[in-house]
Regions:
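An N-terminal assembly and electron-transfer interface module characteristic of large anaerobic redox
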Residues: 8, 19-584
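N-terminal signal peptide c-region/cleavage motif recognized by signal peptidases
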Residues: 14-17
Length: 584
């Protein structure tokens, strides 16, 4: 009788253990997005496991009783700094030998207070990631908790240290040849190949929604996207990944490491490298409303360092939605449009390229063709010679002639009554008012009202003239073959006003001139000549600009090259981050 009671008691205890779900605690830094916690909690629940997650900010620690009742603690620490932060927050809580745990990221993986075979299996599931592995992790925990064997489950599926990804492929590819063979039926044979550098963690975390949409948009632009992850520690990672691929441009989508090695590889590849960022402090509406599109705490890592490695034109392309990165359509299209323009610039023969060059008038003065410590006329003459030698169709003009031309052009802004004579002499260009109004009326209502409130109705602008029965903006500009030479228009109606003002909207004529450069003249690239102009100082976010901000509306997707004095690092940052420029 006593033996029967003992058996029943043991059976009851076993059944109770089975009835109570295994308890998993997931602890990470706040670098790990909440969407991962939510997704893992859902998969755990489907396996009969309860997961409670906690994301720690710097200096935070889990509540004293948070670990109580946990059967397994998972430490998710992607970077060494995350690992140090989480381990410091835990203190000596793991030293007692009673809390089973695994740790992945920020260094070699590890586990404690678990049988070696089980600990290695759980680490393998979590470290390699992906939905199949992570679901098996929770099934393994459920079985272990219930006293059932775990080794009958499939072993962890390894995720290679390098590979190629596409959302429509059945699985990632270990090498480029297999990926290109798979994509041969998707892309035109001459589709430009664009490398997208993605984090391995996005694949492991099954957090690829924003990447998936970007790759599909890239294909709609006629591009062949090569989404690759690689081992940062390998100094030849990109060379090995893209050997024989004829990659035309690179787009960085991750927190890139090993900068010196990547810089050397970028130089060897000799293609444009564009930087992208994600906004982690809210959704798209929050980002649009923010004065800074990139938080100060991330500016050094995601703006400053990448610039020193050769990346340019940083664009914020995603924000958080329900804890997951979500692509912002307008920003993504701005990135892809810029890629299209860069690809066109690379493919066009030099003789067919049209370049626009803007020079400055600061400090103001009708005869002042100036830039900081730059002899502008002499430099223009030398640039013209170099362009002709490279095959560009640029008319010959010596320094003296360039001085005369540039000063006459400036006179059109100081004495608007001379515009008619300049136009007759071929020293002015024009844009139909209707073309400007078509562009202007497509602006958001708040921008239109802001400009009207400050500058009035564009139909009454002083630069309008009747030409062949049509109202047109007229402004100084000289054609030197396929090079358009023009003074940058006054950003606030009159020369010298509001040069660094980041609150006053630009004048209608200012935007009309840039529209002409983009659409009327059809420039393939724009040269902002010397230190410095005003476009990069227009109102908008201080960094991480939206395509709706004035600086980007003026430029559109034009590639910009900006010879800049080397000792003015601070203002050159504005040219790169707000002027979409490659500084020279």
């Amino acid at each position: 009788m006593r033996r029967s009671l003992l058996f029943c008691g043991a059976l009851l205890a076993s059944l109770c253990a089975w009835a109570e779900p295994a308890q998993v605690r997931l602890l990470s830094s706040d670098f790990v997005l909440p969407g991962k916690h939510q997704r893992l909690a859902g998969w755990a629940r489907e396996a009969g496991v309860e997961l409670r997650g906690l994301r720690l900010g710097i200096g935070e620690a889990p509540p004293g009783d948070w670990l109580d009742g946990g059967d397994l603690l998972i430490l998710d620490t992607p970077r060494p700094t995350d690992r140090a932060q989480v381990e410091q927050a835990l203190g000596e809580r793991l030293q007692g030998g009673t809390q089973p745990w695994i740790r992945v990221g920020g260094g070699p993986p590890g586990f404690g207070d678990l049988p070696a075979a089980l600990g290695g299996r759980l680490v393998g599931y979590y470290a390699n990631g992906g939905e199949a592995n992570l679901r098996r992790l929770f099934e393994a925990v459920r079985r272990w908790h219930a006293g059932l064997p775990v080794d009958a489950l499939p072993a962890p599926q390894p995720l290679a240290q390098a590979g190629f990804y596409h959302p429509d492929a059945p699985a990632p590819f270990a090498g480029l040849a297999d990926y290109l063979a798979w994509g041969a039926s998707r892309w035109a044979s001459d589709a430009p190949r664009i490398a997208f550098l993605i984090p391995r963690g996005a694949i492991a975390d099954a957090q690829t929604g924003a990447i998936d949409e970007l790759l599909r948009r890239s294909e709609r632009h006629g591009q062949a996207p090569l989404a690759v992850w690689f081992d940062d520690s390998d100094p030849e990672a990109l060379r090995k990944s893209f050997a024989g691929a004829d990659v035309q441009a690179l787009v960085n989508l991750q927190h890139l490491q090993n900068g010196p090695a990547r810089r050397a590889e970028f130089l060897a590849l000799d293609v444009p490298v564009l930087q992208t960022l994600g906004y982690r402090d809210g959704n798209e509406a929050d980002w649009l409303a923010a004065a800074s599109g990139v938080a100060p705490r991330t500016a050094a890592a995601f703006l400053g360092m990448p610039e020193t490695w050769g990346m340019s034109d940083p664009l914020v392309i995603s924000a958080l939605e329900n804890g997951e990165p979500k692509l912002m359509a307008g920003q993504a299209e701005a990135l892809l449009d810029k890629l299209d323009r860069l690809l066109r610039l690379r493919r066009l023969p030099a003789a067919d390229k049209h370049l626009a060059l803007m020079f400055w008038n600061h400090p103001e003065g009708e005869k002042n063709v100036a830039a900081s410590h730059l002899n502008v006329p002499a430099s223009l003459a030398r640039l013209g010679e170099a362009l002709r030698a490279a095959g560009y169709r640029v008319a010959t003009s010596d320094e003296s002639a360039l001085i005369d031309t540039a000063q006459r052009l400036l006179g059109g802004y100081y004495r608007p009554q001379t515009l008619d004579a300049l136009y007759r002499d071929g020293l002015a260009a024009s844009l139909p008012l209707d073309a400007y109004l078509h562009w202007f009326e497509a602006l958001p209502a708040d921008l239109r009202e802001e400009m009207r409130a400050r500058w009035g109705d564009p139909r009454r602008h002083w630069a309008l003239r009747d030409i062949d029965g049509q109202r047109r903006f007229v402004f100084p500009a000289a054609r030197l073959g396929n090079l358009l030479l023009l003074p940058q228009p006054p950003r606030a109606g009159r020369p010298g006003e509001a040069y660094h003002d980041s609150a006053v909207p630009p004048d209608h004529l200012y935007l009309a001139v840039y529209q002409f450069v983009r659409e009327g003249f059809g420039a393939d690239a724009l040269i902002h000549f010397g230190t410095h102009g005003t476009q990069e100082w227009l109102p908008g976010k201080d960094r991480g600009l939206a395509v709706g901000d004035y600086p980007l509306r003026a430029l559109g997707d034009l590639p910009v090259f900006y010879p800049y004095i080397q000792d003015n690092v601070g203002e050159a940052i504005q040219a790169r981050r707000r002027g979409r420029a490659v500084t020279v």
